């Protein structure tokens, strides 16, 4: 049983350094991890030697008498004393080693574009016929033709209203001002038709994924520190998640976290894999690094609902499953009729857990750009090692770390922003995507065909 990153650290540390460099991280962490792991192994071997010596001496004592016996007893005590000291050192080394191993990022897949940030992300395909305001045509071409894609689009001569103004001024179905007063920035109140739309989106995603055999899960909304350490890179993301004061608990930022922990510390027979789950949960995020980006509206908020795909897989199957997960997300957005592109995320923008990541970005007509709606990652054995989740091979009962993968299906508030911008009419009416209508029909007060603007009062 071997963790891929530890194997590379021991056998080809210089190669592992190259992977760390691709992420634009300091490669010296590899040297420190290599040195500490080597010292830990040598100390472990020395402890085994000391124990063997002590056992040999202890077996000799009953056979001896007088001075010889006293000498052996003294030798045994000395060995025990040394053993105690070395075991203390080993414990310290184990803690240091684990911290260093946990700080190592995943191995970057060979198909990932190398670059320090999202400006190096590479679009790989487009879908749909975007509506492009005449003032954004050059901007649109910069996001399509620059990468060698000729995307058909519809020119409109009226500029669409941004989702924030649509929500609060045109439809009057949201209030971020009052939410800001009572909870702070990046919170919101949503009302009536938008709430129904939120629920319909979640039902739409769940209906599709459960029909494909995914097991529906309502997970815990909080996790212990030990578990969070296994799921994410806590050193990087500790300021992005909420901690419950006075408790060893953190609010989840996505259902991925509790779904990854669902089989923590388990050995799973290979014939049971893949295990496919679809989780639904609220998500809580500090958005500490967002600064002043997307302060208006509900695109980047502290809480939202999300349907998440999560799979436990055999290593040899995981790359095919990654394509399945992004394909599922594409199916949902095609059903909604929202134009999008799939982007291969650059190495410096991956985040420590992912070996490779795709984003699905929806076209936002009022902004004149594509924005992230879905994130799909193959984490390979990065989480499995930290949470000790292994698969058992039938031949020889060999245990090895399995692979975990995750992908957004629908993040409701972000998808609502895309609907408000893509399906608005010049008069402010928003057409409801046809695929959502059957999920809205169960509510007597829900909109079925369209959401209409509030009529302006006459003076």
UniProtKB/Swiss-Prot annotation:
Pathway: Aminoacyl-tRNA biosynthesis; selenocysteinyl-tRNA(Sec) biosynthesis; L-seryl-tRNA(Sec) from L-serine and tRNA(Sec): step 1/1. Gene3D superfamilies: Bira Bifunctional Protein, Domain 2, Serine-tRNA synthetase, tRNA binding domain. SUPFAM superfamilies: Class II aaRS and biotin synthetases, tRNA-binding arm. ATP binds at residues 285-287, 301, 372-375. The keyword Acetylation does not apply. One of its GO terms (molecular function) is ATP binding. It holds the Pfam family tRNA-synt_2b. Keywords: Aminoacyl-tRNA synthetase, ATP-binding, Cytoplasm, Ligase, Nucleotide-binding, Protein biosynthesis. L-serine binds at residues 254-256, 308, 408. Its main location: cytoplasm. It comes from the Archaea. One of its GO terms (biological process) is selenocysteine biosynthetic process. HAMAP family: Ser_tRNA_synth_type1. Homodimer. The tRNA molecule binds across the dimer. Consists of two distinct domains, a catalytic core and a N-terminal extension that is involved in tRNA binding. Belongs to the class-II aminoacyl-tRNA synthetase family. Type-1 seryl-tRNA synthetase subfamily. This is Serine--tRNA ligase. The lineage of its organism: Archaea, Thermoproteota, Thermoprotei, Desulfurococcales, Desulfurococcaceae.
């Amino acid at each position: 049983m071997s963790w891929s990153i530890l194997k590379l650290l021991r056998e080809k540390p210089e190669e592992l350094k190259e992977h760390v460099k691709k992420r634009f991280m300091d490669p010296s962490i590899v040297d420190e991890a290599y040195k500490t792991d080597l010292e830990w192994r040598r100390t472990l071997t020395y402890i085994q030697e000391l124990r063997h010596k002590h056992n040999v001496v202890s077996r000799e004592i009953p056979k001896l008498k007088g001075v010889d016996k006293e000498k052996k007893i003294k030798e045994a005590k000395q060995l025990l004393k040394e053993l105690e000291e070395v075991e203390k050192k080993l414990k310290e080394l184990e803690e240091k080693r684990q911290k260093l191993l946990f700080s190592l990022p995943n191995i970057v897949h060979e198909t990932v574009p190398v670059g320090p940030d999202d400006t190096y992300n590479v679009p790989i395909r487009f879908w749909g016929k975007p509506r492009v305001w005449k003032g954004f045509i050059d901007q649109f071409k910069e996001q399509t033709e620059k990468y060698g894609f000729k995307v058909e689009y519809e020119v409109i001569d009226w500029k669409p209203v941004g989702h924030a103004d649509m929500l609060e001024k045109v439809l009057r179905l949201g209030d971020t001002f009052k939410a800001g007063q009572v909870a702070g920035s990046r919170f919101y109140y949503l009302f009536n038709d938008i709430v129904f739309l939120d629920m319909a989106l979640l039902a739409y995603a769940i209906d599709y994924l459960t029909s494909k055999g995914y097991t529906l899960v309502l997970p815990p909304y909080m996790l212990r520190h030990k578990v969070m350490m296994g799921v994410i890179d806590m050193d990087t993301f500790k300021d992005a998640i909420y901690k419950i004061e006075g408790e060893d608990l953190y609010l989840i930022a996505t259902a991925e976290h509790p779904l990854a922990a669902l089989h923590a510390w388990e050995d799973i027979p290979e014939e049971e894999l893949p295990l496919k789950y679809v989780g639904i949960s609220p998500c809580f995020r500090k958005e500490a690094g967002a600064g002043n980006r997307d302060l208006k509206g509900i695109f980047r908020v502290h809480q939202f609902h999300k349907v998440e795909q999560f799979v436990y897989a055999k290593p040899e199957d995981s790359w095919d499953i990654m394509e399945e997960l992004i394909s599922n997300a594409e199916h949902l957005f095609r059903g909604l009729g929202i134009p999008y592109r799939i982007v291969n995320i650059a190495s410096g923008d991956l985040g420590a857990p992912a070996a490779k990541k795709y984003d699905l970005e929806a076209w936002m007509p009022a902004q004149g750009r594509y924005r992230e709606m879905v994130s799909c990652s193959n984490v390979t054995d990065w989480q499995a090692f930290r949470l000790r989740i292994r698969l058992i091979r039938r031949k020889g009962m060999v245990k090895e770390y399995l692979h975990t993968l995750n992908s957004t299906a629908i993040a409701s508030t972000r998808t609502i922003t895309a609907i408000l911008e893509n399906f608005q009419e010049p008069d402010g009416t928003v057409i409801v995507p046809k695929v959502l209508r059957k999920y809205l029909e169960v509510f007597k007060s829900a909109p079925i065909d369209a959401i209409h603007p509030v009529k302006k009062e006459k003076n």
